[in-house]
Every structure is written in structure tokens, then in C-alpha cells.
Amino acid sequence: MNRIKKTFENLKNNNRKALGIFLTAGDPDMDTSLEILTKLPPNGVDFIEIGMPFSDPMADGPTIQESSERALKSGMTLKKCLLIVKKIREKNNEIPIILMGYYNPIYQYGRKLFVKTALEYGVDGLIVVDLPAEEDEELYNYSEKNNLSFIRLITPTTNHTRLKHILKDASGFIYYVSITGITGTQSAKLTEVSIKLDNIKQLTNLPIVIGFGIRTPKQALDMSSISDGIVVGSAVVDTIKASLDNNQAASSSTVFNCLNFISEISNKMRHI
């Protein structure tokens, strides 16, 4: 049983919802990024989404765009991003790790080499935000053949016909984008999301995770109540940004502030 399936089954058996955290690899630098990522599991995180920095992140709002810029400026590459996963696995072999990003860096790296290296280093799933289901056959087939979960995005504007097409080949979990537009710029209404999720649940048995627009512990609790889990990204990255010094470098409070905020979300979801 792969890590994603095992994690969601264990959480379901314990009547809990999954907390996923998104962080850009190498933001604000490789060492700080790695320290935060390796400390996520003991701070209540159930799965990790690692953003692969890209110079043109069109689906992301200012927060994640700036995060990518800081990471690239610090020297982060896709190769180093994969090495971060390898280093996390040296300390934790249980938590699911999903890479999230854009197709261009994967294409430049080499699709087969990317999948091979990702699996070798301990990646469990892949989310490619700018690769439509109609155009991802080669990367999808190679990923699925090698047991790398290909996680699909569904948005509020996805119609029923397209929804069935997307779900047909989905694996791992379903990532529901709760807002239209770019990341981190607005929040979704619980009732609207709940109706959409009810429609999706009729067509798949995969866990459904809500992302985009979750910024507070209260929102995390509310959204997790209607889903199998949630992802918090921009709000965590904003916490990192707020702790940086005048040179946009990590300060003595960066790691602590970030993990403290994540713990607040986790505790709220666990009713602690």
C-alpha cells in the first residue's frame, strides 16, 4: 500500500482529516526550507506538498510568486528540489510527499528521468497545474506505470462532462481548488464548496482534499469538516515572508514562526 492511501485510510479509521502544507522548495534558502519541511510531521502535518519553483507561475498569486522568486534567487533548481525530498526521507519514510508545479521544468529536466528520480528519492504524487488532462498522456502514463500518483485538479468551473473525464484517470486523491483565479487571493464559501464536493463524491471513491484560499485555523476546520483533508499554502508562505530580515533572508524567528502557525491550524483541526 502506498503512503498516500495508507495515510488517508489511517486518518479515516481514526475519524480525522488530513492536513497538508504547501511550501516552495528553497524558500527562503535551501537549509531553512529543509529544516521546516523535516519538522512538519511532528507539528501535526499529514502530508507535504513541495512546490517546484518556476519563473512564470501563472496559477499562483503574489505570495507564491514571490516565494518562487526567493527560491530561484537562492539557487534552487528542480534537481535540488528532488534532493530535498531525498533528505526528508532520511528522517521520515512515512509521510506522503507530493511535488506540485509546472510542466516546463519537468520537460526540460526530462520526463522519464524526472519520474525515475522522484520515485527513487521518495516522492509519492505529482500535481502539474498547467497540464490539462487532454495533454498529459505521456507524463501520466509513465507516472502511473511506475506507481507515482497523478493527482488531478478540479475547479469550481469544471463541468460534469469534463469532471467525469478528469476523474477517470485520477489517483492518490482529488485536489479541489476552492476558488476561481490565482492562489491566496480570496476565500471560498463553505456552502458552495460543499455542494461541489457532493457532486464529485458521486463519481469517485478517492479522498477529496480542498486547497487554495484556506488562510486561518477556523477556515481549515470548516473546510476539513466537508472533505477528507485540506492544504494550506499561501498563509504559511506569508508567515515565512513576514519573518525575513531586510535582505529577504531567514531570521532567527523564521522556522519557529512558521511551525507555530502550522501547529495552530493542526490543533484547531484536532480540537485541541
Which sequence ranges carry the predicted segments?
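Catalytic cores of alpha/beta
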Residues: 30-40, 158-168, 210, 214-230
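Active-site/ligand-binding-proximal alpha/beta "capping" segment
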Residues: 113-116, 175-180, 184-229
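Alpha/beta catalytic cores of nucleotide-metabolism and tRNA/nucleoside-modifying enzymes
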Residues: 198-204, 215-272
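Active-site-adjacent beta->alpha loops and helix N-cap segments on the catalytic face
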Residues: 1-11, 56-66, 76-88, 106-113, ...
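Alpha-helix-loop-beta-strand connector modules within alpha/beta enzyme cores
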Residues: 63-98, 141-151, 155, 192-208, ...
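Glycine-rich phosphate-binding active-site loops on the catalytic face of alpha/beta enzymes
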Residues: 45-56, 125-127, 176-184, 213, ...
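Conserved N-terminal beta1-alpha1 strand-loop-helix module at the mouth
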Residues: 1-94, 108-111, 168, 251-257, ...
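Hydrophobic faces of well-ordered beta-strands that scaffold small-molecule active sites
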Residues: 19-23, 48-50, 97-101, 126-128, ...
